[in-house]
Structures are given as structure tokens and as C-alpha cells.
């Protein structure tokens, strides 16, 4: 959808990146707040309550966005409301799934998120055949309601657990406790470098595929529609990547899994932008591999953090991770767009994608320290 709104509102690549980042900014604020809520009121209650806002918020963007500033703030509002279910879902898994199966369970959660993202892109691509970009977004905005109702059904017999804190300890005392937890903080930093790459990838892949289609002679409307379909196909690879990564983490180790897949995705960050002129089938295949590798270690980062801190401040640990990790995800799409604007045609895409690799390159180093500390 980005190329169509970019053309409709005459946005630069930097402005388009800022709108993408606005969602992540709202999302990280939401994750920070809901981490405390989940610790205080219980993960199930937090999940179902914040889901109401997640159902309502997309409609504000659909009905009111009409230019850079309105799109920026309304997309931030959407992110603010959408983030409320993520941390409680992680906490629910930690509460109700045994350690030996926790990595795979986290993988299925991330796979479900990826499936939802792929379905959204597929629905948007189909809707664009019959309506404009605003109508397509309206079709997508109907999907969170289905998810929320499904959540009510699935969690109907699940207990709402509130972990007791030590006597006299306030909820805010958990913040310095997390900062002093070396293993927990290494996990948070590793996740942050991972997010720099992954959220930049998700923000810019449809636009990149649109540019590739335009270079192959497609008209703008057709290119945007096909790019959404191709991007949706590549996000289906996220589903497999999440499950494979989570299963590997249970069988062969948490940090080994993170190291393996972070190195594969780094190689693709530094190469895919220079390969825009490849045959489309091969380029889409690389995009699928990129998404597979980029998310294969995501659930494992969440599992490592859950196993590194006491359960009574796990929500706060996820909240701190949200500020640091999604803060990186706010910045990376902007840096990508800035690099694309500066470099222009030709080498622009190669340089822009390489900014994701540069930001993520510290991830394997942090994970190696985490691995050595666990031995």
C-alpha cells in the first residue's frame, strides 16, 4: 500500500519511512505500558482488554488519514492500540507451557503473527482489484475483530495468573532489577539488533518489490498489487521460519539457533538490494528466504528472556525490551528511507538494504557473549 499512498500524498521516501516508523513508535509505547499491566492484573485479562482497542484503531486511519501528518499520527495511534496483545501472549505461554516445549510454542505464536500479516497483505492485494487503497485498508481493518473473538474462545478455560512480588517490593522496583540482570539485558540487546533488521525488512519489502516490478515494465497500479501478493507470499515463509526456529531452539539450543539464523539474514541484508534486476521469480525466492531467516530466531529471543528473569517481573522485562527493541525498529525504516533518498536510483536499494545489515551486525556478537555466559 505504501507506493500508492506515497504517490497520492506526494511523499518522499524519508516521509514514507517516518509513517512506517510511527506505527512502531506507538507499538513500543504500548508494549512498555502493557508489560506493567500484565504483571499487575494478569496476562489473560490484559490480552483480552487491550484487544478491544486493537479492533477499533485501524478505522481511524482508514477514515481520517489524508496526508503526511495525519497519516503519521493515526498510524502511531494504530500501533499504540495494536501492541497491547503481544506481551501478554508471551507471558501466557511462559505461564502455561513447560520449558521443553516453550521454544516451539513461542515459534507458533510468532508464526501466527506472520500468518496474520500475510493474510492482511493478501486481503489488501485482492481488494485493490476492486477498490482504491482506502477501501483495501478498510477490508484489512475488519480482520482484528475476528482475531479478538477467536482469542476469547481459545482462552475461555485458561486461568488468569498474577505472580506475587516479594513483600514490600513495588512494581517499579522491577525496572532496576531487570537492568542488573546481565543475561536478561544481553537478550534484550540481541533482540534490539534483530528488530532493527526485521522491522526495516517488513516496512520496505513491498516497496522494493514494487520497484522491481516497475523496472520489469509493470504499470504502477499493477506493480503495487503484484508486490503485495509477492510480499504476502514471502511473509508466509515467516510462518515456517518461526516454527522451524522455535523447534531448533528446543532441540539444539537457544543461542545456537539465534547465531545460525542471524548470520543468514545478515548475508541477505547486505546482498538483496544489489540484486533488484534479477528475474522476478528468483528475487521473490530470495525475499522468502530473507523473511524465513529474519524471523527464525525471533521467538527464541523471547524464550531466552523469559528464562532469564523471575516470573513476577517478566512483563516489565518485556516492557524494557519493547522500548529498546522496537525503538530500533522505529529508527531503521527512517534510516533506510534516508539512505534511499540520498543514493537515488541505481545503487540506492543496495545501500538502503545494507543499512539494515549494519545495524544488525552487532547481534551475533551479543548472542555469542550470551552463549559463553551460559556454558
What are these regions (language model features)?
Residues 152-176:
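Flexible cytoplasmic inter-helical loops of multi-pass small-molecule transporters
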Residues 184-235, 239:
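Extracytoplasmic gate region of multi-pass secondary transporters
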Residues 109-155:
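Helix-loop-helix hairpin linking two adjacent transmembrane segments in secondary transporters
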Residues 149-154, 354-375:
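Multi-pass alpha-helical transporter architecture, strongest
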Residues 74-112:
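Cytoplasmic helix-loop-helix junction between adjacent transmembrane helices
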Residues 24-32, 117-118, 235-243, 330:
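Residue-level signature of mid-helix packing/kink "hotspots" within the transmembrane helices
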Residues 29-66:
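Conserved MFS/SLC helix-loop-helix module at the cytosolic interface between two early adjacent transmembrane helices
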Amino acid at each position: 500500500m505504501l507506493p500508492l499512498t506515497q504517490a497520492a500524498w506526494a511523499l518522499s521516501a524519508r516521509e514514507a519511512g517516518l509513517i512506517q516508523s510511527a506505527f512502531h513508535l506507538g507499538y513500543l509505547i504500548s508494549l512498555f505500558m502493557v508489560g506493567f499491566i500484565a504483571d499487575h492484573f494478569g496476562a489473560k485479562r490484559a490480552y483480552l482488554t487491550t484487544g478491544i482497542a486493537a479492533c477499533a484503531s485501524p478505522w481511524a486511519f482508514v477514515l481520517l488519514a489524508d496526508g503526511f501528518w495525519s497519516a503519521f499520527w493515526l498510524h502511531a495511534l494504530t500501533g499504540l492500540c495494536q501492541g497491547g496483545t503481544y506481551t501478554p501472549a508471551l507471558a501466557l505461554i511462559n505461564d502455561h507451557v513447560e520449558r521443553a516445549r516453550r521454544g516451539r510454542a513461542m515459534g507458533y505464536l510468532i508464526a501466527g503473527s506472520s500468518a496474520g500479516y500475510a493474510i492482511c497483505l493478501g486481503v489488501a492485494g485482492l481488494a485493490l482489484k476492486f477498490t482504491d487503497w482506502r477501501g483495501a485498508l478498510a477490508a484489512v481493518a475488519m480482520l482484528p475483530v475476528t482475531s479478538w473473538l477467536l482469542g476469547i474462545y481459545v482462552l475461555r478455560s485458561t486461568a488468569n495468573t498474577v505472580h506475587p512480588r516479594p513483600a514490600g517490593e513495588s512494581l517499579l522496583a522491577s525496572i532496576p532489577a531487570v537492568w542488573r540482570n546481565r543475561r536478561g539485558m544481553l537478550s534484550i540487546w540481541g533482540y534490539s539488533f534483530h528488530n532493527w533488521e526485521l522491522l526495516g525488512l517488513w516496512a520496505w519489502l513491498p516497496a522494493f518489490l514494487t520497484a522491481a516490478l516497475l523496472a520489469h515494465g509493470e504499470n504502477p497500479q499493477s506493480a503495487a498489487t503484484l508486490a503485495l501478493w509477492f510480499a504476502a507470499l514471502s511473509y508466509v515463509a515467516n510462518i515456517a521460519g518461526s516454527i522451524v526456529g522455535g523447534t531448533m531452539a528446543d532441540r539444539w539450543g537457544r543461542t545456537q539457533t539465534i547465531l545460525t539464523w542471524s548470520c543468514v539474514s545478515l548475508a541477505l541484508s547486505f546482498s538483496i538490494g544489489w540484486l533488484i534486476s534479477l528475474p522476478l521469480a528468483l528475487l521473490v525466492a530470495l525475499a522468502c528466504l530473507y523473511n524465513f531467516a529474519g524471523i527464525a530466531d525471533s521467538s527464541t529471543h523471547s524464550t531466552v528472556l523469559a528464562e532469564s528473569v523471575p516470573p513476577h517481573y517478566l512483563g516489565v522485562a518485556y516492557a524494557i525490551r519493547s522500548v529498546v527493541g522496537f525503538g530500533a525498529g522505529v529508527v531503521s525504516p527512517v534510516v533506510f528511507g534516508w539512505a534511499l533518498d540520498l543514493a537515488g536510483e541505481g545503487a540506492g536499494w543496495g545501500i538502503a538494504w545494507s543499512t539494515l545489515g549494519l545495524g544488525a551486525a552487532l547481534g551475533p556478537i551479543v548472542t555469542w557473549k550470551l552463549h559463553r555466559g551460559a556454558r
